[in-house]
Regions:
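Short terminal hydrophobic/aromatic SLiMs and anchors at protein ends
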Residues: 5, 12-16, 25
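Mid-to-C-terminal alpha-helical segments outside catalytic/metal-binding sites
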Residues: 271-307
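Extended substrate/RNA-proximal surfaces in nucleic-acid metabolism proteins
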Residues: 91, 97-225, 306-307
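Compositionally biased, intrinsically disordered low-complexity segments enriched in Pro/Arg/Gln/His
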Residues: 7, 11, 19, 31-40
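Short acidic/histidine-rich active-site segments
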Residues: 83, 197, 258-273, 293
């Protein structure tokens, strides 16, 4: 073994198929400065899908079905994040409060059936002004691994329901209102990651003016709050045909050291992990080489695996 370096091989117990060789400097060499703190044994690169739904809401299938697809596609970890119940009303696409026990049971069942795949317990929660107490109540009900925060409503206006809804709107004004709510969601510190950041582009209604400063202002709020944002492949399956968020948005996020999660926003099991090769390439092009992993609301950063 040379005096300047030696090779150590790290094997992840949770992703046995992945093996990585890391070069470690000699004891006399200066320690490198890491952009993000890394924990031992997490030099192993991973692909993690933290956004998927079930038949309890507006999806199909159950967590076991999502897990089966994830294994087929070579994912290293997944998280179920069905739509959480709203505090004061029921809809066709949110769980009822009485569904929570069933949902948690389904996730536990998937964990038992697929022990080789880490499956995390999460929720996607709509941020609505005044929801804070309800989200805190939800947090105390079960040992959640993470919460995704989303903005689907601007007042009573549904952000992602139809192009017809947008056709009569002042688009720039609606985008500004959306990001005002998005900043509030970040500053609430109720969420671990914010899903599909530029959701208003879904139907290709985009601002006519330069929104760089709006994006930067929103992302500063995220950075100050210590929240992650999601890189979502769902937009590739929508009229916008684009990953959420846009490249300029994600580059600003990287400059501000905002961490990321990956998500497919799968509403059918077949979409779990869809286009994750493109997502990984896109994230790397914007400067990212790490993604978030959550356990019991605690975050760590792991290397982003290339596909």
């Amino acid at each position: 073994m040379g005096s300047s370096s030696f090779l150590i091989a790290l094997q992840s117990t949770e992703s046995p198929a992945i093996r990585q060789v890391v070069r470690q400097p000699s004891p006399d060499a200066p320690l490198p400065t890491l952009r993000y703190p890394l924990k031992p044994l997490h030099f192993v690169a991973m692909l993690i899908d933290y956004h998927m739904h079930t038949e309890l809401t507006d999806g199909t299938g159950r967590p076991v079905d999502c897990a089966r697809v994830a294994i087929e596609r070579g994912l290293d970890e997944i998280g179920c994040s069905d739509h959480a119940p709203l505090a004061d009303r029921e809809t066709d696409w949110h769980m009822k409060k009485s569904d929570l026990e069933t949902y948690v049971g389904w996730v536990r069942d998937a964990q038992a059936k697929f022990p080789q795949l880490p499956i995390k317990l999460g929720l996607e929660i709509d941020f609505l002004p005044g929801c804070e107490a309800w989200v805190r109540d939800l947090a105390a009900m079960y040992p959640w691994d993470y919460f995704l925060g989303s903005v689907h409503y601007i007042g009573e206006f549904p952000v992602d329901r139809s192009a017809e809804d947008w056709a009569t709107q002042d688009v720039d004004a609606r985008w500004r209102e959306y990001f005002d709510l998005w900043k509030q969601a970040a500053r609430s510190r109720l969420f671990d990651s914010l899903a599909h950041p530029d959701l208003p582009k879904k139907f290709n209604f985009r601002p006519k003016t330069d929104f760089t400063n709006v994006f930067a202002d929103a992302l500063r709020a995220v950075a100050e709050s210590g929240v992650a944002i999601e890189v979502s492949t769902a937009g590739l399956r929508k009229p916008c045909k684009e990953i959420y968020p846009s490249e300029p948005f994600l580059r600003i996020a990287h400059r501000l050291n905002v961490p990321i999660t990956l998500g497919s926003d799968a509403h059918v099991p077949h979409d779990v992990g869809t286009d994750f090769g493109r997502a990984a390439t896109f994230a790397r092009a914007c400067g990212y080489d790490k993604i978030c992993r959550f356990t019991l609301r605690k975050r760590e950063l792991v290397k982003l695996r290339a596909v």
